[in-house]
Amino acid sequence: MVCLGNICRSPLAEGILQHKAQQAGLSWSVDSAGTNGYHTGDAPHRLSQKVALLHGIDISHQCARRFTAADCKQFDKIYAMAEDVIDEMRRIARKDFDATKVDLLMNELYPGKNMDVPDPWYGPEPGYHKVFKMIDEATDAIINKYASEKSRNPEIKK
């Protein structure tokens, strides 16, 4: 899960997907990063933490980090929160960028629509609730898609 600063959207996405994967009995490694290093080492934004906790998800342990080319090799799938984030990922990763692994998160819910998850940074709390809802719905689609693929092909690992 990748956004700009790794303190608002992508920490929520990491926490939500990890929570759902655990509930589904999946041993997935879910991580998040930002394309800039402004907040490296910082905890998620207090409103991201608050909104997640209202839904029973604690993201306070997360620590912002910068996206690297190595992420393109380490992860099977990388979701970006916005088109400009993908552009920056491509610039950072250069030859290691693998477009087959990268997609906008909202394309899981609305294939081909290329919708961004809006950045709630600097905005009021309701924006964080809206972002949570969008990510929650998209991560449901990821879990359901995986369950459907697994039912057709039992060889797929947890």
Model-derived features with residue positions:
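Short beta-strand scaffold positions
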Residues: M1, A80-M81
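Conserved active-site segments centered on acidic
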Residues: M1-Q74, N144-N153, K157
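Phosphate-binding/catalytic loops
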Residues: K77, E83-K158
